[in-house]
Amino acid sequence: MEMSFRWYGEDDPVTLENIRQIPTMKGIVTAIYDVPVGEVWPRERIQQLKETVEASGLKISVIESVPVHEDIKLGRPTRDVLIDNYIQTIKNLAAEGIDTICYNFMPVFDWTRTDLAYEYPDGSTALIFDEEVSKKMDPVNGELSLPGWDSSYTKEEMRAIMDAYADVDEEKLWEHLEYFIKRIIPEAEAVGVKMAIHPDDPPYSIFGLPRIITGLDSVERFVNLYDSKSNGITLCVGSYASDPKNDVLEISRRAFELNRVNFVHARNIKLGEGKSFKESAHPSEYGSIDMYEVIKLCHEFGFEGAIRPDHGRMIWGETGRPGYGLYDRALGATYLSGLYEAVVKAAK
């Protein structure tokens, strides 16, 4: 497997030079962040991004994400032109040698948390999701925005888009996803690109919106939409584990058995009451996920793709983009690499 690290471009306080100094680090997970959702990523912009990353001694491992326009998720008549644009972006990325694209099909919101700076007793801060707090949040107030999101909305825009989803239940969303998949995957397969859908985060309905990539059954249903290695998943163990009903190791094993794991996000979370959870340090003892067993599965199934430490705590006085500081994610990367070395040597 190839250790990689999320980088948010030139505006990211974590620099490529910082990232390169992390032991075993090989790849960068990044995107073009200023092209409006739904428009084609120009090939020259992709070339510039690639040159910037490679000048640091690293390479682009994965594009995360090429956002999916809401009109595609809503099944609106405009979706065909938007899907054409999406396909052209896939082709442009492939032409620059980029072969893995992470994306999601979450309506309106990307990953959602209720507190970006929950303080642990040791003074570190982390992202958390409190189920009871979430029930009191009103997304229509226009103030809800998180660091991982591709779009932010005014009150009027939010009200309109939430109203639009009133007629879209889970089955309708599945229909719209299937339409999208059957358009893009043959094109991705033809140019050697592996698509990797990210699970919903958290993997259950919030704010009355449908969520469909949520657990074992949905993974199996998803891969059956189109039979191709290019129609794969991002195995984000922290997202799947956020629902206490999910057995994340069972989901992981099944996804590997199906040969559809195209990218891995490895972060730990600590389950709380109901569906509440806190993001934790990566080592198993701090969370609810046995990270050793996750890495063991990666080795057992010969996973050679990119893996990245996911959200980290803010430690040692660091400030910046919540969840995406340098220090704790660097610790996570070295921990994961240590687990991998141990697994490989134990298997000999």
UniProtKB/Swiss-Prot annotation:
GO molecular function, one term: mannonate dehydratase activity
Cited InterPro entries: Man_deHydtase, Xyl_isomerase-like_sf
Nucleotide-binding listed as a keyword: no
EC numbers on record: 4.2.1.8
Keyword line: Iron, Lyase, Manganese
GO BP terms: D-glucuronate catabolic process
Catalyzed reactions: D-mannonate = 2-dehydro-3-deoxy-D-gluconate + H2O
Keyword 4Fe-4S: no
SUPFAM superfamilies named among the record's database cross-references: Xylose isomerase-like (SSF51658)
Obligatory cofactor(s): Fe(2+); Mn(2+)
Pathway given in the UniProt record: Carbohydrate metabolism; pentose and glucuronate interconversion
One Pfam match: UxuA
Function field: Catalyzes the dehydration of D-mannonate.
Family statement drawn from the similarity comment of this UniProt entry: Belongs to the mannonate dehydratase family.
Entry protein name: Mannonate dehydratase
Annotated organism of origin: Streptococcus uberis (strain ATCC BAA-854 / 0140J)
